[in-house]
A protein has these predicted regions:
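Class I S-adenosyl-L-methionine-dependent methyltransferase catalytic core
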Residues: 2-162, 166-405
Length: 405
């Protein structure tokens, strides 16, 4: 298993810890929002022109999404900007103060059980500009939950949805967007790629990923004090009051130029001869025991001239060019198509690194390599005299004819 895959497993554990601790809501930095929106604008300067943008799960007191779109309202050519926020009583703590303070100054008692709607569509102050100062707000009838009828109406009015939803609600939130057929850009965890509700959309080229985050980790502001003892927040990851969240990606259906840049790859022969990876150099590519595909442990080791199916790490999707490769499926239980499997296994003996043996059925969870001898220092599986190693989840791809090699 590669270092990247070990990190992915660590990311998964960390995310699960965060969900259990109810700490999966983070506020995105302005620079990260700007970088991603610029990618769309570089590809198409009119990405947002004449459109209504909805920012659900958003609170202008904390979130930079509203600030970015409000400050760039004219430059983007927006028609209307709508933000909604949850009611304080619907959240774990009462985060916002700015707009509640305005309500108190007007003699209106803050309504903690109701969410808010913020709208920007014209110059309110009369200074000749349309910006953050022109935002008008009022209370919603309900608590601001995106699943409510009134927020659904706002979704239906909008052309584009942009936000960073709580990771624990990612599947439901994405389905909520797709149901309405809207353009969108949302932040989620990379592990969502293999969700059975998400992968078919990626395979069908209805949504794709972008990864402008350095080393795949984003730094976010948390609305509550975070216990840095949690594995999700290692002390060396804490930066100026920001939390490092690993494995985050943008999920979108907005076009950007990066996804049309083909990977520069070597032929199979050159990879075997020159690859920088010891798993490939001088060894070649092994075939799975349970899929009609070869194992490619690194994206930069994909052979440019192989016409069959290849299993590649899920991080491949960060650099996936639909003009160069076709996604065939995913080798992972739950999300994958069982018809792609060529073998199903009975119970097997799992031999841990320390030699402990356990009866399991894990080999049916993903791609499997059959080996001649037990690997030294690695976990493996036995079925009779056969010895196997399990590979982490893989995206199954094949190259398109006439692609750029």
């Amino acid at each position: 298993m590669s270092a990247t895959e070990h990190q992915t497993m660590s990311d998964t554990t960390a995310l699960q810890n965060a969900k259990r601790a109810k700490l999966d809501e983070f506020y995105t930095q302005y620079a990260d929002i700007q970088t991603e929106m610029n990618a769309y604008l570089e590809y198409n300067p009119d990405t947002f022109r004449g459109k209504t943008v909805l920012l659900p799960c958003d609170d202008p007191e904390w979130s930079n999404f509203t600030r970015y779109f409000a400050e760039n309202f004219a430059a983007l050519g927006l028609k209307k900007l709508i933000s909604t926020s949850y009611a304080p009583d619907a959240k774990r703590e009462r985060y916002g103060i700015l707009f509640d303070y305005a309500a108190e100054m007007s003699g209106e008692k803050p309504k903690n059980e109701r969410g808010k709607i913020f709208v920007l569509d014209h110059d309110v102050t009369g200074d000749g500009k349309v910006n953050f100062e022109d935002i008008e707000w009022k209370y919603l009838d309900g608590d601001g939950d995106f699943r409510s009828a009134e927020v659904k109406e706002l979704r239906d009015e909008a052309d584009v949805v942009v936000t960073n939803p709580p990771f624990s609600l990612f599947r439901e939130f994405l389905a909520w967007i797709m149901e309405a057929g809207k353009e969108f850009a949302i932040i989620g965890n990379r592990n969502a790629i293999t969700y059975k509700e998400v992968f078919p959309l990626i395979k069908a080229n209805r949504i794709w990923l972008d990864n402008p985050f350095v080393r795949g980790a984003g730094y976010f502001k948390s609305p509550i004090e975070v216990d840095k003892k949690l594995s999700y927040y290692n002390s060396h990851d804490y930066r100026e009051g920001l939390i490092r969240v690993p494995g985050v990606r943008w999920f979108t259906n907005l076009e950007h130029g990066r996804r049309h840049q083909p990977l520069q790859l070597m032929t199979m022969a050159d990879n075997i001869k020159y690859s920088r990876h010891k798993e490939v150099k001088g060894i070649g590519y092994r075939k799975y025991d349970n899929y009609d595909a070869i194992e490619v442990p690194f994206t930069d080791a994909i052979p440019s001239d192989y016409d069959g199916v290849m299993g590649v790490p899920i991080s491949f999707l960060d650099k996936y060019c639909p003009d160069q490769f076709e996604i065939v499926g995913v080798a992972k239980a739950g999300a994958g198509d069982p018809a792609l499997k060529t073998r199903f296994y009975p119970e097997q003996i799992q031999v841990a690194r320390d030699g402990r043996e356990t009866t399991v059925t894990k080999l049916n969870d993903g791609p499997v390599l059959k080996v001649a001898d037990p690997p030294e220092g690695e976990q493996y599986y036995k079925i009779g005299d056969e010895i196997f190693m399990q590979v982490y989840a893989r995206i199954l791809i094949c190259r398109k004819r006439g692609d750029v090699k």
